[in-house]
Regions:
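Conserved N-terminal phosphate-binding loop of PLP-dependent enzymes in the Aspartate aminotransferase
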Residues: 2-402
């Protein structure tokens, strides 16, 4: 009897919600059904999803930043098919692979020139976990400083650096020595670092939650202060990297040189998870400092051939299709066009962001009638007004966003 994924899809095309309710997270199913997002998607191409009726949906969530080159890009599909047909030796744990070496070389050509070593893992949160360990070992310090409202993942170490209480609630005690400070606040940062006992300061160049863009002097001063107090500067580019902000790395907007860059999401091409940390030679040599420490940190499936092939193909597509340049131009046009409407609509405060990493912020209107409606919604649930926009966008205009 042959095994066929296509047959499984055909047999169970309408079973996914029932299967998840029975065997997975039933609260996710309840939420989707409650807000009317319970669609049976059958196909995905580029930025579009298609349901059973052939209805086209514009996916602005992009898998939370995964699909920088669109869904099911043929170049990545062909690279994965070719990798499978070659019958390559994979995950030979007492060996090193060609593809991981090539991907490391390609990535390091895009990073600041002080970074010349790569560590591969399977996800963004794993890259943050690695950065925590590497920073502590290299500096011989325990403390990690992070930003309020920041997001770095949900595994225990990364969760300890999560600036949103809803994710942390009930999972303590978390990793000790992790302290939050306000984002874009240099005075708070210097105060936190001044005792010279902080291993690393980790920050998203543009915060993913809310798309908060720092002042132009912020990251250059972060770099200076970290050097002054012997703290490693870690840029979390899991959300912002690979062209999303209109530069290959968001840090390129400010020409800073962190000690480590965490990356993942878009590097996968939307297929095989891959995460990585770019770092200085000094950090790599400090952690992996003897032959008996050659495997002191790692992951079983890191550097697997499919993940590395997906990463190489993704970088090729980004260069060939000039996606970074397109992100800058298109994003600037969108932000400017939306801000031009702010005088026309009372609720619209501003559109902000970098490249195609964009947020629209709403505000309390001035007219009494609308102001009362706003106050009522805010009192009921602080995020309710935005839901009243995103749900009709989905149901009436077939746009998926949050």
């Amino acid at each position: 009897m042959t095994f066929s994924i296509a047959e499984l899809f055909e047999q169970h095309s309408t079973d996914k919600f029932d299967l998840h309710e029975r065997h997975l997270n039933n609260q996710m199913v309840r939420m989707l059904k409650t807000i009317g997002y319970d669609r049976h998607y059958q196909r995905a191409v580029g930025q579009y999803l298609y349901d059973q009726a052939g209805t086209e949906y514009l996916d602005l969530l992009s898998g939370f930043g995964v699909f920088a080159i669109g869904r099911n890009h043929p170049t990545v599909i062909n690279a994965l098919k070719e990798t499978l047909t070659l019958e390559l030796p994979n995950l030979v744990q007492l060996d090193v692979s060609i593809l991981s070496g090539l991907l490391a070389k390609e990535l390091l050509e895009t990073t600041p020139d002080n970074l010349d070593k790569m560590f591969f893992c399977n996800s963004g949160t794993e890259s943050v976990e690695a950065a925590i360990k590497f920073a502590r070992y290299t500096t011989k310090r325990e403390k990690i400083v992070f930003c309020e409202h920041g997001y770095h993942g949900l595994t225990m170490g990364a969760l300890s650096l999560n600036g949103e209480e809803i994710f942390r609630e009930g999972f303590g005690p978390l990793v000790p020595g992790c302290s939050p400070i306000p984002f874009n606040d240099l005075e708070a940062l210097e105060k936190a670092l001044s005792n010279k006992d902080v291993a690393a300061f980790i920050v998203e160049p543009v915060q993913g939650k809310g798309v908060n863009v720092p002042d132009d002097n912020y990251l250059p001063e972060v770099e200076r202060l970290c050097k002054k107090y012997g703290t490693l500067f870690v840029a979390d580019e899991v959300q912002t990297g690979l062209g999303r902000t209109g530069k290959f790395w968001a840090i390129d907007h400010w020409n800073v040189k962190p000690d480590m860059i965490c990356m993942a999401k878009a590097l996968s091409g939307g297929f095989v998870p891959v995460g990585a940390v770019a770092m200085t030679h000094k950090i790599m040599d400090s952690v992996f400092n003897r032959m008996d420490r050659a495997v002191v940190h790692g992951s079983t499936f890191a550097k697997n051939n499919l993940a590395m092939a997906a990463g190489l193909a993704t970088l090729h597509v980004m260069e060939e299709e000039k996606l970074v340049e397109n992100s800058l131009k298109t994003g600037t046009d969108i932000i400017n066009s939306l801000n031009a409407l702010s005088g026309k609509y009372e609720f619209l405060k501003e559109a902000r962001g970098k490249g195609m990493m964009i947020a629209i912020e709403f505000q309390s209107p001035k007219s009494l009638t609308l102001k009362a409606a706003w106050a009522m919604l805010e009192a009921a649930n602080k995020g309710l007004f935005c839901q009243m926009i995103t749900i009709p966008l989905f149901k009436e205009h077939h746009i998926l966003t949050q």
